[in-house]
Amino acid sequence: MAIKFLEVIKPFCVILPEIQKPERKIQFKEKVLWTAITLFIFLVCCQIPLFGIMSSDSADPFYWMRVILASNRGTLMELGISPIVTSGLIMQLLAGAKIIEVGDTPKDRALFNGAQKLFGMIITIGQSIVYVMTGMYGDPSEMGAGICLLITIQLFVAGLIVLLLDELLQKGYGLGSGISLFIATNICETIVWKAFSPTTVNTGRGMEFEGAIIALFHLLATRTDKVRALREAFYRQNLPNLMNLIATIFVFAVVIYFQGFRVDLPIKSARYRGQYNTYPIKLFYTSNIPIILQSALVSNLYVISQMLSARFSGNLLVSLLGTWSDTSSGGPARAYPVGGLCHYLSPPESFGSVLEDPVHAVVYIVFMLGSCAFFSKTWIEVSGSSAKDVAKQLKEQQMVMRGHRETSMVHELNRYIPTAAAFGGLCIGALSVLADFLGAIGSGTGILLAVTIIYQYFEIFVKEQSEVGSMGALLF
């Protein structure tokens, strides 16, 4: 069945737009340049409004997922990386359930990647139509078929640009991947904005600055009771406060600390005597992949729930999936799940909410830990990082594990890699929950993604530096 499926996909893969692999080794300076160009294009698309929309002032139904999915409401980046990640999620689940078996051959890998890109384009079209027809930009009957089609085309072209930008970096022209770059940029931008935003918000206590740092100085300057001013700056509700900022810094430090946890397996050369090395198996073996896929799962569930809720409000099954309420406290108007499955899969708003509704907290914790562990364990099977794949790579490099024969390497690696993947995914989920409960800026998932991505780029720089010799030689 797997071969038949990949063969069915093959004719479509030929006509898909594709970035050619570089014919020569790309120098680090060029990689930095291409990465900067990619980021510039993404940021420009984040600021270009969609042409033809009548209104985007209503409550934002996807406010809680925008930071993680690198999307910006009412712009060309409305969909963000959602189509790419969703297609990856679908293909992984199909491969994990053995509905599609991906072989070890380069041909099968290429067809699998092509199928993922094809699904990404189909999902882009589907999400574009759903966004337009559910009235996110105005009543479709008032806008007319022409404007609806125009908005759909804009969203599709923007989604295609994101797909190609991600492929450009992954083919070796830039550093890391487009998905990682866009997520990290969006989250870091959010953190900086929440800390230093000069925007004023009218609260019950009067006009206050949104940014936590600016609010601290403003409150100290305008309040006669300095102790109360400090208390407000640290604990004010519905706006970023200093405790949120401290929690964010704390989570950053904890994740970076855990990044250093690993098991070094001793290996030696099968060709040369006395040549020894180690193969590191990190605690976060699959890095941030589990949390990205978990976010894609939840975001698509939110989309389906809100679409059904808008059309069939009051239906029992729709209500069981999720009921939604609009809120505008402490920021822009947004929709928030207040009941049903979506409510229990969303993080509690604060530590106080955990105490008020412990069942919600327990369900959320179990879901986060379980889903992250599952996605992490299944990801290694389809990404070429399982014990069998690692043993094959070591064999190609003529390396063997010390104290083990070449034939027993897979068995020995199986003792470590699946465990590291599952336990690492579990830890990723636990850290995300901790960040949510502490009230970290940008959500626990967002902070975790930002730290792991920034650490990945740090490792890339260190690796390139060791190859070239110095940071100056890298850039100049």
Curated annotation (Swiss-Prot):
Spans traversing the lipid bilayer: 29-46, 81-97, 110-131, 149-167, 178-196, 242-259, 286-306, 357-379, 421-437, 444-458
Lumenal side: 47-80, 132-148, 197-241, 307-356, 438-443
Subcellular localization: Endoplasmic reticulum membrane
Domain of life the protein comes from: Eukaryota
Gene Ontology BP annotations: cotranslational protein targeting to membrane; post-translational protein targeting to membrane, translocation; pronephric nephron development; protein insertion into ER membrane; protein targeting to ER; SRP-dependent cotranslational protein targeting to membrane, translocation
Cytoplasmic side: 2-28, 98-109, 168-177, 260-285, 380-420, 459-476
Entry's Gene Ontology cellular component terms: endoplasmic reticulum membrane; Sec61 translocon complex
Membrane topology note: Multi-pass membrane protein
Family annotation (Pfam families): Plug_translocon (PF10559), SecY (PF00344)
GO molecular function: protein transmembrane transporter activity; ribosome binding; signal sequence binding
Quaternary structure, from the entry: The SEC61 channel-forming translocon complex consists of channel-forming core components SEC61A1, SEC61B and SEC61G and different auxiliary components such as SEC62 and SEC63. The SEC61 channel associates with the multi-pass translocon (MPT) complex.
Similarity-based family: Belongs to the SecY/SEC61-alpha family.
PANTHER family: SECY/SEC61-ALPHA FAMILY MEMBER (PTHR10906)
Role this protein plays: Component of SEC61 channel-forming translocon complex that mediates transport of signal peptide-containing precursor polypeptides across the endoplasmic reticulum (ER). Forms a ribosome receptor and a gated pore in the ER membrane, both functions required for cotranslational translocation of nascent polypeptides. May cooperate with auxiliary protein SEC62, SEC63 and HSPA5/BiP to enable post-translational transport of small presecretory proteins.
Protein name: Protein transport protein Sec61 subunit alpha isoform 1
Taxonomic source organism: Canis lupus familiaris (Dog)
